UniProtKB/Swiss-Prot annotation:
Biological source species: Caldivirga maquilingensis (strain ATCC 700844 / DSM 13496 / JCM 10307 / IC-167)
Class of this enzyme: ligase
Protein localization: Cytoplasm
Annotated EC: 6.1.1.7
Protein name: Alanine--tRNA ligase
Cellular-component GO terms for this entry: cytoplasm
InterPro entries: aa-tRNA-synth_II/BPL/LPL (IPR045864), Ala-tRNA-lgiase_IIc (IPR002318), Ala-tRNA-ligase_IIc_anticod-bd (IPR018162), Ala-tRNA-synth_IIc_core (IPR018165), Ala-tRNA-synth_IIc_N (IPR018164), Ala-tRNA_lgiase_arc (IPR022429), Ala-tRNA_ligase (IPR050058), Thr/Ala-tRNA-synth_IIc_edit (IPR018163)
Function (record text): Catalyzes the attachment of alanine to tRNA(Ala) in a two-step reaction: alanine is first activated by ATP to form Ala-AMP and then transferred to the acceptor end of tRNA(Ala). Also edits incorrectly charged Ser-tRNA(Ala) and Gly-tRNA(Ala) via its editing domain.
Pfam families referenced in this protein's UniProt entry, alphabetically: tRNA-synt_2c (PF01411), tRNA_SAD (PF07973)
MF terms (GO), sorted A to Z: alanine-tRNA ligase activity; aminoacyl-tRNA deacylase activity; ATP binding; tRNA binding; zinc ion binding
One GO term (biological process): alanyl-tRNA aminoacylation
Length: 899
């Protein structure tokens, strides 16, 4: 952590207005105030809330929307451009799943100076999600997983200063005092250091009556490992908590009662819960706030707060538990709705894991309060409020309800398996057991604890259990970096970027280039190349290099930074040689059809299944390619048919396919973040591939692959197979062009073969199969009738061979028919105690429970075999055929039967 630069924080408003800088005796932080009698920093837990039931200021908003608009308008009037909110899923980043603050919108591309900001200065109100405090939600009175961070940002580039610390603090003070009507001496500025997303800087936490309402960060460090390096860009990064400001202005007992008041009232009616005593609620919120950050030591916290309030701790727990559950339902339902609306499908991996975590917590709390309504009713009730503030949720409302309903069904199924799962765990259940039960089966630890208690096993559930889970899954796992070659960046550091002829003309299959470097005898760097290097799910081109009358095969092509390296098999050219390049044109065209076909197929899937569909992975290859997409169930045959028809309509429409380089900001503003279907694209410019144009534009994506120039050149898109490969991910296997034709011809060949075997024409196969199935069913019914007669005959013979051993009836019988259903029915009608059936080298033992089948199997194994089983059934094999008399005699001699 860098040392706080005190001189930076001595702003002109503090000096000019006579603010006093003091050190808090409780937490040690310095703070600035106009209040001469203030003796602490003004933050929790150093001071209690002073606004509950007594809101500060003169401004009384009618709704939370009024506060948001007041903030944005305030900064618009002061030269800031209003910017629309970004999605809560950070598709433009590969280091985090979710947007946790407004600055996430501009990291890393703007903060690193790769691209300019969308406006400068700007103001925004960004929905954000943080699960670091998920276990505190509902308990502390102020924590949320989803919140809106209102902000104003300024990006100060070298030679182009916008504004810095003085103006930022003045804006904050003016907003809180003039716009909201707070007294000057009620606004405290606490010094601190902020760090996040690879950047850091000094900051002020803006506090009013015990609550932090905003953070003003002056970002000028880049964090690299343990080092803090000065950035060329100095960034004003502010965050004003919309919900917290609204809470303070209403003076409600908790942030939930302020923000979700309408929903909570409806939910209490729906669930049959009484409205709590606001005085007790207010007192509880004040005291729980002051116990923070130790608030998670719940047992001690409730006892301590109960003492302070003057009631019994058990009475307090009975009072707070239903309210805590309601607050969790309110917060989590909004957060999950935001996530699903922005394309998240609840699952057991990736960002979907985090959505499922919140839904499972809601279901757990529904269980705690004994709710008898489905979770979808909670969501439906809340969504009817949320769509007034977030109208975009209206379009996603049915999808949200469908996914929540599906998640509840999966949860109930998992819970039904709990007794069996717990029985497999020997001894005490550890935290790792609880984590594994949640990660593998989605069972909340509190439910595990209750089930374990029935078995006399005590389970301790950490109060921060869900925070532990979220921390394990909050970032994407880092894949292997670099290339597969024995070539490093140092090997090519002295070389210029390779000219990429494959982008200039994707139909250039031949060309000439100059050799710039030969590395280790087989890695060739040219000044330009028509060979496409592997990337974006598209394999590298193959072909040959010809020079000096010889030829070398190009077997692989990879990027090493901006340089393209060709791997050859054969003679090696010399530096300075001019080589003739020739790629396998048929293979390249096949891959181009597959890549353009992937874009068309993905867009067709989205149009049929819904806008929540995102690409989860792709591999373009020949003769088959795959496309993985996010979706919550396997598509129906009719949906697959519609997808294929839609894709081929685009092929037949002969739409143009064009690629162009665009500034990242311009592309995002024009097309939205949907351009990142294929993942994060680095750099200040992105290559946009557009299928169609004008009103006929079908698909737009950022893509670095090679594409056809018109859709008709694909010829045909044929979906071969559709599978669910994991929860929330569907895989489409497809083919295009001549490979699609080959696939159809192969199917026709199989159809002709079936027709020949059925002795019918190709168009009569379906009816012939129906007739065959009917005949087979009739034959099976006749077989069952005959089997029943055979069983009667076999039983008569078995009973004749029955012997008595230790008072029990035992029969050993050689059976020519080894059909499981037949044997089971035969055994069920056997009137004795032990039945041994032998077929060749195999045996089966059936008993009525008086004798253990496994004991009989152990005896039979002495004849040279192996087998095992349970109390009433066993099976095994003999190493060699055995005689019936040997089996009978062995049983008589060695089997000890006990009742």
């Amino acid at each position: 952590m860098p040392i706080l630069n005190e001189s930076l924080l001595r702003t002109r408003i503090f000096i000019g207005r006579g603010f006093r800088r003091s050190r808090c005796p409780y937490c040690g932080h310095h703070y600035w105030t106009l209040n001469p009698s203030q003796d602490n920093c003004g933050d929790q837990p150093c001071t209690p809330y002073g606004f509950i039931g007594n809101p500060p200021g003169t401004y009384r908003p009618e709704s939370i929307k009024d506060v948001r608009e007041r903030f944005l308008s305030f900064f618009e009037k002061r030269g800031h451009t209003r910017v629309a909110r970004y999605p809560v899923v950070a598709r433009w980043r590969n280091d985090v799943y979710l947007v946790g603050a407004s600055i996430y919108d501009f990291q890393p591309w703007v903060t690193e100076g790769v691209v300019p900001p969308p406006a400068n200065p700007l103001t925004i109100s960004q929905p954000s999600i943080r699960l670091t405090d998920v276990d505190k939600v509902g308990r502390s009175g102020r924590h949320l997983t989803g919140f809106e961070m209102m902000a104003h940002h300024a990006f100060n580039f070298p030679g182009k200063e916008i504004y810095w610390i003085n103006e930022t603090v003045e804006y904050a003070h003016e907003f809180f005092t003039r716009e909201l009507g707070f007294r000057d001496d009620e606004v405290t500025y606490k010094e601190n250091i902020w760090e996040g997303g690879g950047n850091a800087g000094e900051s002020f936490e803006v506090l009013v009556r015990g609550l932090e309402l905003a953070t003003l960060v002056f970002m000028h460090y880049r964090v690299i490992g343990d080092e803090y390096r000065e950035m060329p860009i100095r960034i004003v990064d502010t965050g004003y908590g919309l919900e917290r400001i609204y809470w303070v202005l209403t003076g409600k007992p908790t942030i939930y009662e302020a923000v979700f008041e309408g929903f909570l009232n409806k939910a209490r009616q729906l669930l049959g819960l009484p409205k709590p005593d606001e005085k007790v609620l207010a007192s509880l919120a004040i005291h729980m706030g002051q116990l923070d950050p130790e608030v998670l030591a719940l047992d001690k916290a409730y006892v301590e707060v109960a003492k302070r309030i003057g009631i019994d701790s058990s009475e307090l727990i009975n009072f707070i538990k239903p309210q805590e559950a309601l607050y969790v339902l309110a917060d989590h339902s909004r957060t999950v709705s935001w996530m699903i609306n922005d394309g998240v499908i609840p699952s057991n991996s990736g960002v979907g894991y985090l959505a499922r975590l919140l839904i499972r917590r809601m279901l757990k709390y529904m269980h705690v309060i004994g709710a008898q309504v489905p979770l979808t009713e909670i969501f439906n009730t809340h969504l009817n409020y949320l769509i007034n503030d977030y109208p975009e949720l209206k379009e996603s409302m049915q999808l949200i309800l469908d996914l929540v309903d599906l998640e509840e069904a999966k949860y109930k199924s998992a819970i039904s398996q709990l007794p069996k799962l717990i029985s497999r765990i020997k001894g005490e259940l550890t935290i790792n057991d609880l984590i594994n039960l949640y990660d593998s089966h989605g069972i909340p630890p509190e439910v595990v604890r209750d089930e374990a208690a029935k078995r006399g096993v005590k389970v301790n559930v950490p109060d921060n259990f869900y925070e532990m889970l979220a921390a394990r899954h909050q970032k994407p796992a880092k894949g292997e970096e670099g290339n597969r070659l024995d070539v490093t960046a140092d090997d090519v550091i002295d070389l210029p970027p390779t000219r990429e002829l494959f982008y200039e003309d994707t139909y250039a299959f031949e060309g000439k280039a100059k050799v710039l470097k030969v590395i280790k005898g087989k890695y060739i760097v040219l000044d330009s190349t028509i060979f496409y290097p592997e990337g974006g799910g598209q394999p590298a081109d193959r072909g040959v290099l010809r020079f000096n009358g010889v030829e070398a095969k190009v077997v692989d092509v990879q990027r090493v930074g901006p340089v393209i390296v060709h791997v050859i098999d054969g003679p090696t050219p010399g530096v300075g040689d001019v080589v003739e390049m020739r790629i396998d044109s048929e293979r390249r065209l096949g891959l181009m059809r597959m890549h353009t076909g992937t874009h068309i197929l993905l867009q067709s899937i989205r149009r049929v299944l819904g806008k929540h569909v995102w690409q989860a992975g792709a591999q373009k290859d020949i003769p088959l390619s795959r496309l993985d997409v996010t979706h919550y169930r396997l598509p129906t045959p009719d949906e697959v048919k519609r997808i294929e028809e839609l894709a081929n309509e685009v092929v037949l429409s002969d739409l143009p396919v064009k690629a162009e380089l665009m500034p990242r900001n311009e592309a995002e503003a024009k097309y939205g973040f949907i351009i990142y279907q294929g993942g994060v694209v680095p750099g200040g410019e992105v290559r946009i591939v557009k299928v169609g144009e004008g009103n006929d534009t079908y698909d737009v994506e950022a893509c670095g692959g090679t594409h056809l120039d018109r859709t008709s050149r694909i010829g045909l898109i044929k979906i071969v197979k559709v599978d669910k490969i994991q929860e929330g991910v569907i895989r489409f296997i497809f083919t295009t062009g001549k490979y699609a034709l080959d696939y159809v011809r192969n199917l026709e060949g199989k159809l002709d073969s079936a027709a020949s075997k059925l002795r019918v024409g190709r168009d009569e196969v379906d009816e012939a199969v129906d007739r065959l199935i009917k005949e087979l069913n009739n034959a099976e019914e006749r077989s069952r009738v005959l089997a029943r007669k055979a069983i009667e005959a076999d039983l008569a013979n078995i009973v004749k061979s029955m012997i008595t051993v230790s008072g029990f009836k035992v029969a050993v019988y050689y059976e020519d028919y080894w059909v499981r259903d037949y044997l089971q029915e035969l055994a069920s009608k056997y009137p004795g105690d032990v039945l041994v059936l032998i077929h060749g080298n195999e045996y089966q033992v059936y008993t009525n429970g008086k004798v253990k089948a496994i004991d009989v199997a152990k005896v039979l194994n002495e004849l040279g075999g192996k087998g095992g089983g349970s109390g009433t059934f066993a099976q095994g094999v003999f190493n060699n055929p055995v005689k019936q008399d040997d089996v009978v005699n062995t049983i008589k001699r060695k089997l000890t039967l006990t009742q």
